[in-house]
Amino acid sequence: MGRARRPGGRLRRVGLGTAISLGVGGIGIGLLIAGGGAVAVHRANTTEFCTGCHVYDRFAQTFEHSQHRANLTGVQVGCADCHVPDDSLAALLWTKARSGVRAAWAYYVEGLDTPEEFARARPELQADAHTWFVATDSQTCRRCHEVAAMDLQAQRAGARASHQAAATGRRTCVDCHSDVPHGQAPARAE
């Protein structure tokens, strides 16, 4: 016959003090990892981080003189404010990973490191961004620009109609504002 089991046998063999120490240590390590991850995500969402890559430095040049960077109010947005969703950590991490892989591919494989290569690729890059903004209903735009808070009566008729359509989901920001903030790219070569 086998040995009779005593309640709490394993815990008693390990020792209550050891179990508590392991639990507290595990929580501490988890907090350090989570804190380090939060710092890494925060730093990776800065404009300086984004534009540190040669692929994106030319987009940074087009952005520097836009209304989202240089304006009368002093409000400035960065790359992540427009290009990184904040609805979930998973969406944020997926977008950052996807962007990083695509940038590395463009730079190292496609050779997108000269002004000429950038000019050639810009229409496709902006078309990809436009597709993403349409697919997400321009949610990153809507974090700052709330149609419900706009004075529609003070707007011209065309803008008023477009913003009313955006409020009901029939239009999205980039349907009209596709040149914000990087300027209009030339038409994509087919």
What are these regions (language model features)?
Residues 2-190:
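Short sequence/structural segments immediately N-terminal
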